[in-house]
């Protein structure tokens, strides 16, 4: 049992190295213990310490003596086990290298977007050549955007170009400098030629693909795995060149650089989408105090006309109550209407116009809903009963209904009644029939309904005084009538 335990079979101990020379301890040294503390070193280091140094154990500082050395010869079984372990280790190492090599084989066809590499195409061969490399690095050209590590001319593109355009790869020290250069150069004109700039792509180094050390210290190819989202195949790049440019152009807004997602194969705009003037007006604090109405068409046509006129081909947009006009919107045109609070244009004496619409509506309802007098039953006033019933049946505007539309309807009724009267400049007086028609017209503003009813249904004994003129302004047949607004009685 003791012999089995002493057999050196631990995999961790197989990889044990000498703590002094850091060399792998051979199988013949694994059973060698030069000190009683158990601190193991190879026999070469033990002999060097004993002969050339102080001869003490590096761990416990005891003197190395021949009597304290513990050593056991290696058996044939241990040799076989050690040989089998070495073969297995070599086999695993070979498989690991093959897996890495197979994983890197497909990388030979991959191109990775390099964020510090700018590719400029469209330069003149007189400028972009091997003799002017130092000039291109200077502040007059690409050096003004940042420190340049290397400039390489794409000779293959120059040879295949029919227009003689040359492409140049500029490797900057910082990614921000490359983004600034691309944003400034792309779309510019140099020597009558339009320049195009974008991020450049690079490939993996052949030594890296073979899992070898690269012998070129200034190699500009990749020696480590690139970002997957920035990787493209040759077929992808070829198809994108025939459709739309690769999204390798940065977005620079207000000095900040935003790199577009390489997974999107299309360019993104350099500048942010600006708001339209109408959107800016809506977002501004001043626009919160205005009511904006828009109709999506082409040309604006706004006509400010009095609210008394109507048109079947126009849509009336009522103005606020403080305004004395409405807006007619003609269909087929775009209209942007800003309703501002306007001061009244009426004289100060017209205090009735300053009343709110609700007060006017309440007065009109009270005037219409009043019951007629007993004199309405008289046979001589039967002709006025339909007029009073018509006045009662008149539809008054509700609280939500627009007062302007109701006034338009009332004036239209007056105009239709006046159309029966013939006006002439030859005569100086109206005939009796025309005077009766004028007197039977209802008033435009009713503030004293009782006086109107008394005027319409006067008693029969006072009918004889109908044609007599009133004695004073505001007095008719002895019954008080409120004078028109803005006048003194």
From Swiss-Prot:
Zinc finger region(s), RING-type: 18-61
Keyword list, A-Z: Coiled coil, Metal-binding, Nucleus, Repressor, RNA-binding, Transcription, Transcription regulation, Zinc, Zinc-finger
GO molecular function terms noted in the UniProt entry: RNA binding; ubiquitin protein ligase activity; ubiquitin-protein transferase activity; zinc ion binding
Transmembrane regions listed in the UniProt entry: none
CDD domains xref list: mRING-HC-C4C4_CNOT4
Residue ranges, compositional bias (Polar residues): 246-261, 466-479
Chain positions covered by the region annotation Disordered: 246-268, 458-489
Protein's UniProt keywords contain Protease: no
Zinc finger (C3H1-type): 199-226
Listed InterPro entries: Mot2, NOT4_mRING-HC-C4C4, Nucleotide-bd_a/b_plait_sf, RBD_domain_sf, RRM_dom, RRM_dom_euk, Znf_CCCH, Znf_RING
Highest taxon of the lineage: Eukaryota
Gene Ontology biological process terms, A to Z: negative regulation of nuclear mRNA surveillance of meiosis-specific transcripts; nuclear-transcribed mRNA poly(A) tail shortening; protein ubiquitination; regulatory ncRNA-mediated gene silencing
Primary residence: nucleus
GO cellular component, one term: CCR4-NOT core complex
Function of the molecule: May negatively regulate the basal and activated transcription of many genes.
Identification of the protein by name: Putative general negative regulator of transcription C16C9.04c
Phylogenetic placement of the source organism: Eukaryota, Fungi, Dikarya, Ascomycota, Taphrinomycotina
